[in-house]
Amino acid sequence: MLLGLGGRWAAGLWPGRTRTTWCVAAALRGSGIAFWRAASLAEPERLRSGGHLALAESCGPPGRAQIPVCWEQCVRCFHTQVDKPENGRLIYTGNLARTIFGVKCFSYSTSVVSLAFLPYLLSQNNMMFGSLPLQVLFYGVMGSFTVITPTLLHLLTKGYVIRLYHEATSDTYRAVTYNVMLSETSTVFHQDDVTIPESAHIFTSFYAKTKSLLVNPALFLNPEDYNHLMGYDKPFTFDMEEVDEKKLHEGEK
């Protein structure tokens, strides 16, 4: 084993006094954990003559200790797949998922705090606010922070797609979104179920059956996946009957 590290290192160590310790460096790559290198560390011993420590010499350039290239292939990596195989291939990941989650958590927390202080405020109503307009204004502001704001946030962000998977064999998609309880919910639909709104909507990119979903075309890992999702890769058909009907209606007007 010492001969694999170099003859000069093996000659500098006392016979029978070598201790080899194996360590594996774990590196996080992508969604798995890979074992890449195994290093052999030898305990330095004093030489018989000089009394100095024997330095380990590398297989590469002088003055830089490194592991031989042949050792890098000793330990093969194993990959832990995060996404389940039945989910399909991940084609889209939303970059605002954490932001939406944090904003909704903050809104829910303020609502809970407001509801917790509501009994105390009701008991101190006459002492704090003497006039009726001030009471109406105060409770209106509290109601907006307690009920209206979380509801509005949910209505605006319920269609935001966190992740989108595509199953090529059945041409089905699985869109992951947040529900009202901030847990992930899935919507499975076929490509034929995708309809594009006639007019542009701020919070709707397309409809999957009857549910509106919002995606950012620039965040797709492959632009062809977005084109296939929206049906842009289908051949264009020009129906002459529809054109004749439109001309007929325009002539009647």
Curated annotation (Swiss-Prot):
Transmembrane intervals: 100-120, 136-156
Alphabetized UniProt keyword annotations: Membrane, Mitochondrion, Mitochondrion inner membrane, Transit peptide, Transmembrane, Transmembrane helix
Chain segment of the transit peptide: 1-77
Pfam family, one: TMEM70
Membrane topology: Multi-pass membrane protein
Compartments (UniProt record): Mitochondrion inner membrane
Mitochondrial intermembrane topological domain: 121-135
GO biological-process terms attached to the record: mitochondrial proton-transporting ATP synthase complex assembly; protein complex oligomerization
GO molecular function: mitochondrial proton-transporting ATP synthase complex binding
Phenotypic consequence of gene deletion: Homozygous knockout mice for Tmem70 are embryonically lethal at about 9.5 days post coitum and exhibit profound growth retardation. Embryos exhibit delayed development of the cardiovascular system and a disturbed heart mitochondrial ultrastructure, with concentric or irregular cristae structures.
Gene Ontology cellular-component terms listed: mitochondrial inner membrane; mitochondrial membrane; mitochondrion
Tree of life domain: Eukaryota
Mitochondrial matrix domain ranges by topology: 78-99, 157-253
Family recorded in the similarity comment: Belongs to the TMEM70 family.
Role description: Scaffold protein that participates in the c-ring assembly of mitochondrial ATP synthase (F(1)F(0) ATP synthase or complex V) by facilitating the membrane insertion and oligomer formation of the subunit c/ATP5MC1 through its interaction. Therefore, participates in the early stage of mitochondrial ATP synthase biogenesis and also protects subunit c/ATP5MC1 against intramitochondrial proteolysis. In addition, binds the mitochondrial proton-transporting ATP synthase complexes I and may play a role in the stability of its membrane-bound subassemblies.
Protein's name in the database: Transmembrane protein 70, mitochondrial
Taxon lineage: Eukaryota, Metazoa, Chordata, Craniata, Vertebrata
